[in-house]
Amino acid sequence: MKRILLMSLLAISTALSTQKPVELELWPDGAPNSNGITTPEQKLENNRISNVSEPTLTIYPAAKPNGLAVVACPGGGYIRLAMNHEGHDMADWFNAQGITYAVLKYRMPNGHHDVPLSDA
C-alpha cells in the first residue's frame, strides 16, 4: 500500500512539475549594432522594462514537447516592453499544449530602427 501511494505521488509530482526556463544572451559576443543606450535597464510598473541594451531569449521548454515552438516579442511601442502579460504569463498555457515557448527581450531602437530588427 505504501509503495502504491509513493509511486502515485511520484507520478503526480512528475506530471505537475514544469521545466525551469532558460535565459540565453542573444549576442554573447556583442550585438552587431548599437542603440546608443548607456543607462541601466529600468524596471517599470507591472513588470514593464525600458532602456533594454542587452537582449535575451527566455525559453520555457514543454515537459512533453510536440515539436512546436512559439516566440513572443512583447509590445510596448518601442519605448518599453510589457514582459508579463504579453510575454512570460503565457508560458504555462503553451507548455500545457506541449508547445515550447520563448520570450524575446529585444533592444529598444532609440532612433536606430535596425536595432530591434537585428534582435528578431
Question: Where in this protein do the model-derived segments appear?
Answer:
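Bacterial Sec-dependent N-terminal signal peptides
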Residues: 1-21
